[in-house]
């Protein structure tokens, strides 16, 4: 084998030498072939023959290594598995604890309710004792007395406050927004006494929003420039003396001042009804238009409570009846604003009766209608009369269905007939007795 390899090497070198000696050989190829070397032959390893003992020893060693690897794997698995088990146990324990806690809470609530019920029963039994019942009755009576006192005190306070309060109508709306005008109003009424508070009412707003919001945002109606006010004085005497301002001028307006506790009564003889007014009408033009007829007590335009706009009519009360007669002459005449007024005497409306007619309410009318259907008009007429009671015999001159009036002549004739009959019966008895004696 060594000889063959050496011969091959010699042949290669000789071939390369020939190629290099020739002038036509490419230098790159020459370099490649010069650098290339023959592939070395692989060296054969020595084979070792194993005996049975060696095989057994190797198997034992392999088994031990496998056992060690298995033990190490089992240890790792043991180290890993308990963690997952612990997690599962924790989860299971938490869920079990939730249910257990829930049932424990339910049991605790039931026990508390039982304890309360038992305590309530004991308290009820104790309360049933006459001493405690008397105490409870005293407490309830005291509470009732306190509540009655509180109600009475509230009523008394309200009455006192109403005695100190004055209603003012036809005030300019700028009194609410302008501080200077508000001060002028307080000065105008402070001449009669100290003023505690002023409350403004009948404010007309331009938007349909809550009244407090509209008041703070000052969204007042542009076509309504009058407001009402309640002025509370510190003394009732000052409130009574402030009534003298009724009909006086304040900021080019006629004021209507009236007491809250004792308002001015409405006299229909001195009052007129004015119709065909605009919904935006104000009191001041009416004061000026009807002022020529006579001195006026008040001008009241009836307004809608929600919008505070007029309903189209008003009432004007004069101080005497002469003003009413002069105001009636203005019927169907135009105001300076251009609307024709409808003027008439005010009428006192009587409250409507509860029953709709003389026949009674609906229940009685339905019963009467059923009776008419059943027994007719004649039977209904008989029902209204006094009927004879069952079980009593009718006397002479009485009708079993209805009592009739007996004439005096009939009574006299009946008495004469009875007397004659009695006399004839007496004569017969005497004759019969005489015959027996004979």
From Swiss-Prot:
Biased amino acid composition, Basic residues: 346-357, 402-412
PROSITE patterns according to UniProt: RRM (PS50102)
Keyword RNA-binding attached: yes
Annotated RRM domain residues: 164-262, 270-348
Keyword presence, Cell membrane: no
SMART domains found in the cross-reference section: RRM (SM00360)
Family annotation (Gene3D superfamilies): 3.30.70.330
Protein name: Nucleolar protein 12
Organism whose genome encodes this protein: Schizosaccharomyces pombe (strain 972 / ATCC 24843) (Fission yeast)
């Amino acid at each position: 084998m060594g000889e063959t390899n050496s011969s091959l090497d010699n042949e290669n070198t000789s071939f390369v030498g020939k190629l290099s000696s020739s002038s036509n050989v490419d230098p790159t190829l020459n370099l490649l072939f010069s650098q290339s070397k023959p592939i070395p032959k692989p060296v054969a390893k020595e084979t070792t023959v194993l005996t049975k003992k060696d095989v057994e020893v190797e198997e034992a060693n392999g088994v031990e290594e496998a056992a060690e690897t298995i033990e190490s794997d089992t240890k790792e698995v043991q180290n890993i598995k308990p963690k997952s088990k612990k997690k599962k146990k924790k989860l299971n324990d938490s869920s079990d604890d939730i249910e257990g806690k829930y049932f424990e809470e339910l049991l605790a609530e039931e026990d508390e309710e039982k304890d309360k019920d038992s305590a309530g029963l004991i308290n009820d039994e104790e309360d049933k004792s006459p001493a405690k019942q008397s105490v409870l009755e005293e407490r309830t009576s005291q509470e009732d007395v306190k509540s009655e006192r509180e109600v009475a005190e509230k009523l008394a306070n309200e009455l006192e406050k109403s005695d100190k309060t004055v209603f003012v109508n036809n005030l300019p709306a700028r009194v609410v927004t302008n501080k200077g005008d508000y001060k002028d109003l307080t000065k105008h009424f402070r001449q009669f006494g100290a003023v505690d508070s002023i409350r403004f009412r009948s404010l007309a707003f331009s938007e349909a929003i809550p009244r407090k919001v509209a008041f703070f945002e000052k969204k007042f109606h542009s076509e309504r420039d009058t407001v009402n006010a309640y002025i509370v004085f510190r003394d009732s005497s000052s409130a009574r003396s402030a009534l003298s301002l009724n009909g006086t001028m304040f900021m080019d307006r006629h004021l209507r001042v009236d007491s809250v506790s004792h308002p001015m009564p409405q006299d229909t003889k001195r009052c007129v009804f004015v119709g065909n007014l605009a919904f935006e009408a104000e009191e001041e033009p009416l004061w000026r238009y009807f002022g020529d007829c006579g001195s006026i007590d008040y001008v009241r335009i009836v307004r809608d409570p929600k919008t505070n706009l007029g309903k189209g009519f008003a009432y004007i009360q004069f101080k005497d009846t002469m003003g009413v007669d002069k105001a009636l002459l203005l019927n169907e005449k135009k105001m300076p604003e251009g609307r024709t007024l409808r003027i008439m005497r005010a009428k006192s409306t009587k409250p409507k009766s509860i029953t709709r007619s003389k026949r009674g309410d609906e229940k009685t009318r339905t019963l009467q209608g059923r009776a008419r259907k059943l027994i007719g008009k004649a039977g209904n007429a008989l029902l209204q009369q006094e009927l004879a009671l069952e079980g009593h015999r009718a006397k002479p001159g009485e009708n079993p269905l209805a009592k009739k009036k007996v004439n005096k002549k009939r009574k006299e004739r009946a008495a004469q007939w009875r007397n004659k009959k009695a006399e004839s019966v007496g004569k017969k008895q005497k004759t019969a007795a005489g015959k027996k004696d004979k």
